[in-house]
From Swiss-Prot:
Signal sequence bounds: none
Organism of this sequence: Salmonella typhimurium (strain LT2 / SGSC1412 / ATCC 700720)
Keywords: ATP-binding, Chaperone, Cytoplasm, Isomerase, Nucleotide-binding
Protein name stated in the entry: Chaperonin GroEL
EC class of the enzyme, as a word: isomerase
Keyword Protease annotated: no
Post-translational modification, as annotated: UMPylated on a tyrosine residue by YdiU under ATP-limited conditions.
A Pfam family matched in the record: Cpn60_TCP1
HAMAP family, alphabetized: CH60 (MF_00600)
Functional note: Together with its co-chaperonin GroES, plays an essential role in assisting protein folding. The GroEL-GroES system forms a nano-cage that allows encapsulation of the non-native substrate proteins and provides a physical environment optimized to promote and accelerate protein folding.
Family named by the database record: Belongs to the chaperonin (HSP60) family.
Amino acid sequence: MAAKDVKFGNDARVKMLRGVNVLADAVKVTLGPKGRNVVLDKSFGAPTITKDGVSVAREIELEDKFENMGAQMVKEVASKANDAAGDGTTTATVLAQSIITEGLKAVAAGMNPMDLKRGIDKAVAAAVEELKALSVPCSDSKAIAQVGTISANSDETVGKLIAEAMDKVGKEGVITVEDGTGLQDELDVVEGMQFDRGYLSPYFINKPETGAVELESPFILLADKKISNIREMLPVLEAVAKAGKPLLIIAEDVEGEALATLVVNTMRGIVKVAAVKAPGFGDRRKAMLQDIATLTGGTVISEEIGMELEKATLEDLGQAKRVVINKDTTTIIDGVGEEAAIQGRVAQIRQQIEEATSDYDREKLQERVAKLAGGVAVIKVGAATEVEMKEKKARVEDALHATRAAVEEGVVAGGGVALIRVASKIADLKGQNEDQNVGIKVALRAMEAPLRQIVLNCGEEPSVVANTVKGGDGNYGYNAATEEYGNMIDMGILDPTKVTRSALQYAASVAGLMITTECMVTDLPKSDAPDLGAAGGMGGMGGMGGMM
């Protein structure tokens, strides 16, 4: 086992604080509408330019291992805030730095670290309750656009696009961000349910100009098996041909003579058919087939529940107003499924989201809800260069997370004002002893830090602005973009409550752990001294040369 380097008490805390400051100082220059950019070098390709706090934090590794431990712990604050609310990473870092700096000063002055932590936790718990009381629901498009604009660093077009997307697909709909092809940002909305499987044969195409298959009012056969024998399908095909409607087959696979016969029937015009593979794999495929069945009012033909394809009737088939299939995607528009059944299915998937443990599972389940409940919107980000595209895409994703958080828990006045108001409301909070009171004061002082940093990044004097804002009440604050005072809500400067709450809670959590740190252990650096064994042998040979 490698030897360890151990530091105790103040030595450990000073090193840790140095690491915290390096990371926090790099991150906090990005805060606010006049925050600066940070350029990140990449091992290949052009450097990345960003104003996203968590992107900056993730790049930082320090040479000194003790300092690096401090930096990594604050990086955790930014990552956690990002995971919880998708934004507020810089605010969380600024809060953490302030609590750690003031807290370690108090520890150095002889305060009890555990009581300090209890005081900080008490203040944060009270602040969270006050934040919830200040929160205003965010339901209309205007407020959503304002939140998106603020989070995208005052880019109004992004805010409007996100509001429009939410308007079209609903609050539950899936909104994805992709690279655009031009200079302008675009919004594409996919109505109905779309999944990423295309036609199994190009011979199904009936719209050569678009290279797509379009079926009007088709029957939809859903089978949880491979279909290779056409005999299994004859009863269904005959029934559909009599009804004079087209047929869409969604199965695990359609191959061999079954596919060949379907193609021949389609080309001869006997019955209009198209076949696609079912989306997903394994259990997820079964679940998605069931989703499609619910949406279209059909039944999944599955041998697991004793159903056979030969015995399927028209009653087992789903129906939709229209289906469009191209080489990569299938879109089912206006399924005839009952609204109550669809809502029941959505509620069931929501329950699974609550219980999901992995982010991947949660994301896939949310996509399924969206496909059943609303639709899918795609924001295509336009930019002149790849570097700008990366930076802008990151901003749009941030803004999207922020607007979702705003819809979830409401909004408070932005620009650091909400935390100032909360701090003034809990200013009389008292702990059980003097050390806890100091902890409460540390947390209250930290709540001013985001406003001060926003003002500092504007090139103004933080203390003057902070005192002026404290002197006002309600939503009165400082608009850093225009450098004027006024009602933040009226000026459209809003922060999602969830973002502010998460930033404060995660900052206090990690800061509390760091204040109560008494010892740090790391591996000793390996010495790079050369191995002298080989050199010694060579010396001996030289001696032998002298004897000859």
